[in-house]
From Swiss-Prot:
Entry keywords, A to Z: Aminopeptidase, Glycoprotein, Hydrolase, Membrane, Protease, Serine protease, Signal-anchor, Transmembrane, Transmembrane helix, Vacuole
Biological function: Type IV dipeptidyl-peptidase which removes N-terminal dipeptides sequentially from polypeptides having unsubstituted N-termini provided that the penultimate residue is proline.
EC number per UniProt: 3.4.14.5
Region called Disordered, residue ranges: 1-33, 45-66, 138-157
Chain intervals with Low complexity compositional bias: 23-33
Active site: S768 (charge relay system), D845 (charge relay system), H878 (charge relay system)
Cytoplasmic topological domain residue ranges: 1-109
Record GO biological process: proteolysis
Gene3D superfamilies per the UniProt record, alphabetical: alpha/beta hydrolase (3.40.50.1820), Dipeptidylpeptidase IV, N-terminal domain (2.140.10.30)
Protein known as: Probable dipeptidyl-aminopeptidase B
Taxonomic path: Eukaryota, Fungi, Dikarya, Ascomycota, Pezizomycotina
């Protein structure tokens, strides 16, 4: 379920910390925006002339003068200031009038008395009126979204704006590449107007003090090329390390979430001509292709078999022969792509270019799940005669919880010997109990680190393999179940640190995320077989997908962390010996930062993602002699748009449930009045290790609800979510949904008790894991707090979801049958106690299968429960996009919620026909 908070990415806040890990083809996917980055840099250099750049953080207008507050007391204070401003204008007017000497003092006193009596009577009448209104049932006062008060020129956030991406901040990605001779600060630039199609720029040329820089280098002059009379257009590009060739993918066809098929071509930079990757199979659909670090060969997978093409010869060498429907080589199957690698590659070159590590996946025992397509034919194949009216069925090997997993082996290929071999190491897991989650080559040493866990992800083994000697050993073994009862998250952030005795590093080593006193921190293991790390970070905070980069020249490690707050992100550095911890970003103000470093860590693209308008700049790191800063994106258009619209007031605070402090954000309507009674919608995701409450900027569906409809929207990250310590995270193990639902309910009770909340109009909604949590909360609450719920693509029984994700948090069903019974949505009588709920699902969902919703409907039918609505979307997967479906999802949520808070569903329980007026017949 990796990445699910972003299923509806255009509607959610940017860079919530479920950021997906980059796959091996990240260069191709990001190169196209680098041109904009470099154009911005060039514009600023031209504008500044010889002016020396500084590292000053640019200041940008906030989303609104009072759009943010840290707690309720701060917000009340701000509202009082607003009222004082209004009173001061009146005061000034009255003062001017009081200077008129001609007004008799007695007359003036009489006027004041009469005015006071009038105002007192008006206030009393208003109080009586409001008092009567307060006792009206919500259904008697329908909410009119168009009647939300508006002052001045402020506009409401609209659904069209949100759905159309108009509130998305412009954000550029940089494709940093390493030069052929190790140069740092090189960018791959693709598709820039007025420039050649694919070029390499040197960011160092933008610094007046830079020396030894490279001239702009053209890799591809045009955005098209010809091979054997065919005109081809690049979809993805992968330059060789020596920058003499470009591997080009065309005719890309999507497979699963990350993987795709394509035709590949080798483009020669000098001659500007191309040839097919495989000269004897021009139309072969290749699943994955990657360069040798020495730029002299390409390894690729086709039809689940691996091949090697050396540039010195047109001949393609077949590495494996038994790949097919049940055996995968070098690419992951569905569950490994989704839950382990979050990418399309299971192939790893060593830096010397002499060896390739790759995964062999055996799916022969994995059951198949049929995904049906009733409208489209994703295979692209015409049906057989007579089968035109039957749906297309795609059988996917999908291991559900407790079912047989694919078995995996790590194999190696010796290029000089053209030999595949395996290194067996004693003390490992049984094949049916083994997950291989990460492979990291130790540079050019011929050694590799392999991270393995058992099936339930609570026992970790790190293995060091020497492929030259063809031997290996276990260097770390940790039973996390004994440590805190939790699990190991999948990670691919381990960083190899080569030995450099002259620079204070006598041995090779690696940096890994470790558990230290309830939090995730960085440890430096050196030598590589040392099981006790040098602790680089510590404290009641966590590192996030760290390290971000390592400056080997200066022994500096860069990382993002939650040191200032669980809901912010700042960039820090620390020395390899664990000393000299420094903040790189300005921690005196709140910020939610991301960073993308150049290959040598001398430069970084710094992304400020909130709480105010996002911006980006390229800066040199502190140890770089060529110091400069260039802003590449300010999002002025977004800032102007924010000024013209009335955005929700965001109140960040915490609640304590069962001794755990939980992060909450409340989105109030722009003209919030504490004397009114507001409906409240809770929005959640809540998956293990996820985070929804953050200080990142985002105007999404929740913002629309608060701004346009005038409802309050609350999000609480309950137990099980990330960045608040492992104790709060791991308490859910074996019983997911229980504590998370309790946290939603207890927080909702706090809101229900607030004077400005209409406790009879409270709803909750979520997608994917959030859909499961919506139903689980309604089930546990049984109508006591929440009256309504909306669940999109929900899991309803964790026995239906994939094994690797589910068993990490629940163990296997064989190990924990009672836990699976508890977590399933089965108490439908409790669901019947809610006023009404809505369920929506994509019929072709290959992730959370439609089986989940259909099984729930059957339970509801058996129990005679009818207080719900259902909408299914033909041929839509988990993101629900097919044939305008995504817009329908949000229109449905919008209209259904308005009807709920208008009390429409209160009138459906015992519907009676209207009397027929004979006069109108």
């Amino acid at each position: 379920m990796a990445g699910h908070p972003e299923e509806n990415a255009q509607l959610l806040s940017t860079e919530q910390e479920s950021m997906s890990r980059n796959s091996s083809d990240s260069v191709a996917s990001t190169a196209s925006t680098t041109s904009l980055v470099f154009d911005r840099i060039g514009e600023r250099v031209a504008a500044n002339g010889s002016e020396k750049p500084t590292m000053v953080t640019p200041k940008f207008p906030p989303r609104g003068e009072r759009a943010y507050a840290d707690d309720e007391h701060t917000q009340i204070h701000l509202e009082e200031e607003e009222e004082k401003d209004y009173d001061m204008e009146d005061g000034a007017f009255l003062t001017n009038g009081a200077t008129n000497k001609s007004v008799d003092k007695k007359l003036r006193r009489l006027i004041w008395i009469i005015g006071g009596v009038f105002i007192g009577a008006w206030v009393l009448a208003l109080f009586i009126f409001l008092g009567k209104q307060a006792y009206k049932h919500s259904s008697e006062s329908p909410h009119d979204p168009q009647a939300t008060s508006s002052r001045g020129s402020g506009k409401k956030v609209t659904m069209d704006q949100v759905m159309g991406g108009q509130w998305r901040a412009t954000k550029h990605s940089i494709s940093w590449i390493e030069g052929a001779n190790g140069e740092d600060g090189l960018l791959l630039e693709q598709g820039s107007v007025g420039k050649d199609y694919l070029i390499v720029e040197d960011v160092r040329t933008q610094s007046p003090s830079a020396v030894g820089t490279l001239d702009t280098m053209t890799l591809m002059k045009n955005g098209y090329f010809e091979v054997a009379g065919r005109s081809l257009t690049p979809s993805k590009v992968y330059p060789s390390k020596d920058l003499k060739k470009v591997l080009v993918a065309t005719d890309v066809q999507s497979n699963w979430r990350h993987s795709f098929y394509a035709k590949y071509w080798i483009f020669d930079v000098e001659t500007q001509t191309a040839e097919p990757l495989d000269p004897v199979d021009l139309d072969g659909r290749v699943q994955l292709a990657s360069w040798s670090p020495k730029s002299d060969a390409i390894v690729f997978t086709r039809d689940n078999n691996m091949y090697l093409r050396k540039l010195a010869s047109p001949t393609v060498v077949q590495i494996t022969v038994d790949g097919g429907p049940e055996f995968f080589y070098g690419v992951p199957d569905w569950v490994y792509e989704e839950e382990v690698f979050a990418g399309a590659s299971a192939t790893w070159w060593d830096d010397s270019g002499k060896y390739i590590a790759f995964l062999r996946t055996n799916e022969s025992e994995v059951p198949e799940y049929p995904v049906q397509y009733f409208v489209s034919r994703p295979s692209g194949k015409d049906p057989l005669p007579g089968e035109e009216n039957y749906p297309e069925v795609r059988e996917i090997k999908y291991p559900k919880a407790g079912a047989p997993n694919p078995t995996v082996d790590l194999l190696f290929y010796d290029i000089s010997k053209a030999e595949v071999f395996e290194v067996k190491i004693a003390g490992g897991f049984e094949p049916k109990d083994l997950l291989i989650t990460e492979v990291v080559w130790a540079g050019s040493t011929g050694k590799a680190l392999i991270r393995e866990t058992n099936r339930e992800s609570d026992v970790l083994r790190v293995v060091l393999v020497d492929v030259v000697a063809r031997e290996g050993k276990t260097v770390r073994f940790t039973d996390i179940a004994k440590l805190d009862g939790g699990w190991f998250e999948v990670s691919e952030d381990t960083r190899y640190i080569p030995a450099d005795p002259a620079n204070g590093r006598p041995h090779d080593g690696y940096i890994d995320t470790i558990i230290h006193e309830n939090y995730d921190h960085l440890g430096y293991f050196t030598p590589m077989d040392n099981s006790e790390p040098i602790l680089l970070t510590s404290g009641d905070w966590e590192v996030v997908k760290a390290p971000s980069a390592v400056d080997l020249k200066n022994n500096i490690v860069y990382f993002i962390s939650t040191k200032e707050s669980p809901i912010t992100r700042q960039l820090y550095s620390v020395k390899l010996d664990g000393t000299d911890l420094k903040a790189i970003t300005d921690t005196s103000t709140e910020g939610y930062y991301g960073a993308s470093f150049s290959k040598g860590a001398g430069y970084v693209l710094l992304n400020y993602n909130g709480p105010n308008i996002p911006w980006q700049k390229v800066i040199s790191t502190p140890s770089n002699d060529n110091q400069y800063t260039h802003i590449i994106e300010e999002n002025k258009g977004l800032a102007d748009m924010a000024k013209k619209h009335e955005l929700p007031i965001l109140i960040y605070q915490t609640v304590t449930v069962d001794g755990f402090e939980l992060q909450v954000v409340e989105r109030r309507p722009p003209h919030f009045n504490p004397k009114k009674k507001y409906p409240v919608l809770f929005y959640l995701y809540g998956g293990p290790g996820s985070q929804t409450v953050s200080k990142s900027f985002g105007v999404d569906f929740q913002s629309y609800i608060a701004s346009n409809l005038g409802y309050i929207v609350v999000t609480v990250d309950g137990r099980g979510t990330g960045f608040i310590g492992r104790k709060a995270r791991t308490i859910i193990r074996g019983n997911i949904g229980h504590y998370e639902a309790r946290d939603q309910i207890e927080t909702a009770k706090i809101w229900a008790s607030k004077k400005y909340v209409d406790e009879s109009r409270m709803a909750i909604w979520g997608w994917s894991y959030g859909g499961f949590m919506t139903l689980k909360t309604l089930e546990q609450d049984a109508g006591e707090t929440f009256s309504y719920g909306m669940a999109v693509a929900p899991v309803t029984d964790w026995r239906f979801y994939d094994s690797i994700y589910t068993e990490r948090y629940m163990h296997t069903p064989q190990h924990n049958p009672g836990g699976y019974d508890n977590t399933s949505i089965s108490d439908v009588k409790s669901l019947a106690k809610n006023v009404r709920f809505l369920v929506m699902h994509g019929v072709a969902d290959d992730n959370v299968h439609m089986q989940n919703t259909l099984t729930l409907l059957d339970k509801l039918d058996l129990a005679g429960v009818e207080n719900y609505d259902v909408h299914v979307f033909p041929d839509s997967d988990h993101s629900i996009y097919f044939h305008n479906a995504n817009r329908i999802v949000y229109d449905k949520l919008n209209n259904w919620l308005i009807n709920a808070f208008n009390g429409e569903w209160l009138r459906t329980a015992n519907a009676v026909p209207l009397e027929i007026d004979a006069a109108k017949v």
